[in-house]
Curated annotation (Swiss-Prot):
This is Guanosine-5'-triphosphate,3'-diphosphate pyrophosphatase. Its EC number is 3.6.1.40. The gene is gppA. Gene3D superfamilies: 3.30.420.40, Exopolyphosphatase. Domain 2, Hypothetical protein af1432. Pathway: Purine metabolism; ppGpp biosynthesis; ppGpp from GTP: step 2/2. GO terms for biological process: guanosine pentaphosphate catabolic process; guanosine tetraphosphate biosynthetic process; nucleobase-containing small molecule interconversion.
Amino acid sequence: MNSTSLYAAIDLGSNSFHMLVVREASGSIQTLTRIKRKVRLAAGLNNDNHLSAEAMERGWQCLRLFAERLQDIPQPQIRVVATATLRLAVNAGEFIAKAQTILGCPVQVISGEEEARLIYQGVAHTTGGADQRLVVDIGGASTELVTGTGAQTTSLFSLSMGCVTWLERYFSDRNLAQENFDDAEKAARDVLRPVADELRFHGWKVCVGASGTVQALQEIMMAQGMDERITLAKLQQLKQRAIQCGRLEELEIEGLTLERALVFPSGLAILIAIFTELNIQSMTLAGGALREGLVYGMLHLAVDQDIRSRTLRNIQRRFIVDTDQANRVAKLADNFLKQVENAWHIEPISRELLLSACQLHEIGLSVDFKQAPYHAAYLVRHLDLPGYTPAQKKLLATLLLNQTNPVDLSSLHQQNAVPPRVAEQLCRLLRLAILFAGRRRDDLVPEITLQALNENLTLTLPGDWLAHHPLGKELIDQESQWQSYVHWPLDVR
């Protein structure tokens, strides 16, 4: 592999050190390596902000691992940044001098505002949805809050609170009592209050979380079969569960890994304070943050206004998808959706996911015609899809699995991006669009009227169409039968 196409970003965080190695390929990035080590540097800071020798040694040990991987990458294509703990430590110079010797490249201690800007860039390049956003990143010793529209930030704040420092300060006795949470939340709200007005002034349409705490919450919610939107009610529920556990070493929540458990209660307390102080309705997980911001900055790639469209284009190119056919199916599905929207009230995001499934429905053919829907579902489940959340990826895979043949109803109910009933409706529209676009020519798609009454679909074709299309009639009869097996009434006229 040509090393000039390789880029590395290293983030010396207060809780973990991370390394991301990517390959640049025709304007998009392909992840090659991700290494994360819990160094807990912030835990080595004493009251005088002096970093202990033990904490420094843990950091250097980790960097020796990273250094081996960096040998193959040109130095101008490596960026190493240090954040909150090394901003605070009075003896940071000692740590950084040795770190630079180990890595063989400069280490830059960045300001809180620069960290916030890079986090925002990472989110803007990798996260779909409305482009007026609030980004929240709870680190080990600092929390970044950024508002922005598209690629531009409108306000940037880096606050001195993090999941490691709050752990040492409010959960040092390892008790998970109501009082510990109350003290941690109150302190976090006090830190937030001076910046809350400006953040609210700039406003946001979506709130995105980009940290280990939010990642942990996502994993918990997926494991417990909840939808992936983080709300204050869910945070309070998890807090009560933590309080029931009583002690940090006894903290057990389905979906919470041992690795994340130590700083989970302190991160949770900070997040509850942020939700309360800023009156956040819901939050989703970001596709990337600081390291992605560093990489995209080195590549000088512009922020794509529609990340999901860029992702779909890249995948279609990679798997040699017939884009004319993908567009034909999408156009037909959208037409069907418009005809039933008064009865089914399908939300814009669900429409977008249906059209995404249309764009990708033939990627399984790149493996083999036999079992193409299974191959398509497998590929979507395992591909990196910037702009789509894990739950949305699961829904796309499920729709592609059920694009033809008998319907696996349980799979539509096991995804949690949309309610099961909506997943069923999207699946029905996708199947019909694929069926009627089957001859791969615009002029051969009949005029179809679709009406919905509750779950009953009535499909009306031009007068003598069925008589002149015996194969088409056979396929429609088969589809009607498959839909009836799962109690989806389809009446064809």
